[in-house]
Amino acid sequence: MAVNRRVPRVRDLAPLLQFNRPQFDTSKRRLGAALTIQDLRRIAKRRTPRAAFDYADGGAEDELSIARARQGFRDIEFHPTILRDVTTVCAGWNVLGQPTVLPFGIAPTGFTRLMHTEGEIAGARAAAAAGIPFSLSTLATCAIEDLVIAVPQGRKWFQLYMWRDRDRSMALVRRVAAAGFDTMLVTVDVPVAGARLRDVRNGMSIPPALTLRTVLDAMGHPRWWFDLLTTEPLAFASLDRWPGTVGEYLNTVFDPSLTFDDLAWIKSQWPGKLVVKGIQTLDDARAVVDRGVDGIVLSNHGGRQLDRAPVPFHLLPHVARELGKHTEILVDTGIMSGADIVAAIALGARCTLIGRAYLYGLMAGGEAGVNRAIEILQTGVIRTMRLLGVTCLEELSPRHVTQLRRLGPIGAPT
């Protein structure tokens, strides 16, 4: 049968002609085009020198730990429920005694101004605006007091590495308490630094050195270098200056003799919530909870310490079944989407922590980039909850998620 054709009329075309107002702000246009955290990663890689990008992006040795952690979140199957009214969805609840708008917070990251000159202040501002906690690292490039002055609002946590000099460690704890931080994350998975081979190959130093390689790299990233050279010198705000690599500094300053017995001593010195970060076995989770901490973080340090370490997401349901009624469980490593966060909550986490996802946003566009990263995750959390047929986090449960493990059946860990 022949198709009848006619000459298009202007009035027929008019409804189809839709022109968006041009966006002349290149940063807004660039960030607005990012729909996923991986999109932000691609932007970050283009805009940041290789050594700085690799410091955030890389892991230990062959980087199998981080690859397996990400695969763990890919290898899940959701089980949605249907015909539920999901007009209104609430993605917040209490975490460690205080309300949070979303079930994730910003993880502690070291040397953050290396990635973007706005550094920790950008992360804290974005977190405060979103109603989620921000964690400041012992290896921060912004002083404790300076962060509070710049961002007086919002909930702040502090991540503590124990030093060989315990008096200096406790002096730092007292500063954190005086500044109004409410939670201390004691990191326990760094007796020595992991072998971060990208940093070694890139000649990563503190502060960055102007070698032939970095000068050549600077030619492709003039804005980054301009920011570095025209702002405060890049250094660890709470530590002494050091001419070597980050790993060498860790091995010189941090205490490899920390044991379970030290937790009670730390708890006696700290008035707020105490959380132990770096739990990788069920036995260790039991031992830490028995010592009266307020929470634990299942973490392999973002795959930056022991390569081939356990996947925290795989460990989560086993720890939650046994200890979920006795402590609050947080989890990190490999989280790149709102669906990842929802899966973790369904399997027993109270909160998740984002590290690289936050840093990709920071490198892509400073504070605006962090806002965009949080927005992407928030949108994903709420969309996934609606598609699962739940209206609040309390309705999520293991029946909504099945883990499909490529390394073999998931047995009960010890």
Curated annotation (Swiss-Prot):
Reported EC number(s) for this entry are 1.1.-.-
Show the active-site residues. 301
Record bears the keyword Oxidoreductase = yes
Q: Catalysed reaction(s)?
A: (S)-lactate + A = pyruvate + AH2
- Alphabetized UniProt keyword annotations: Flavoprotein, FMN, Oxidoreductase
Question: Organism's domain of life?
Answer: Bacteria
Which Pfam families does the entry mention?
FMN_dh (PF01070)
Q: Which GO terms describe its molecular function?
A: FMN binding; oxidoreductase activity
- Which amino acids does the record list as binding a 2-oxocarboxylate? 55, 161, 196, 304
Q: Known SUPFAM superfamilies for this protein?
A: FMN-linked oxidoreductases (SSF51395)
InterPro entries, A to Z: Aldolase_TIM, Alpha-hydoxy_acid_DH_FMN, FMN-dep_DH, FMN_HAD, FMN_hydac_DH_AS
Which residues pair up as cystines? none
Tell me which residues make up the FMN hydroxy acid dehydrogenase domain.
Answer: 29-406
* Family statement drawn from the similarity comment of this UniProt entry: Belongs to the FMN-dependent alpha-hydroxy acid dehydrogenase family.
Q: Which PANTHER family match?
A: 2-HYDROXYACID OXIDASE 1 (PTHR10578:SF107), S -2-HYDROXY-ACID OXIDASE-RELATED (PTHR10578)
Q: What is this protein called?
A: Putative L-lactate dehydrogenase
Q: Which organism is it from?
A: Mycobacterium tuberculosis (strain ATCC 25618 / H37Rv)
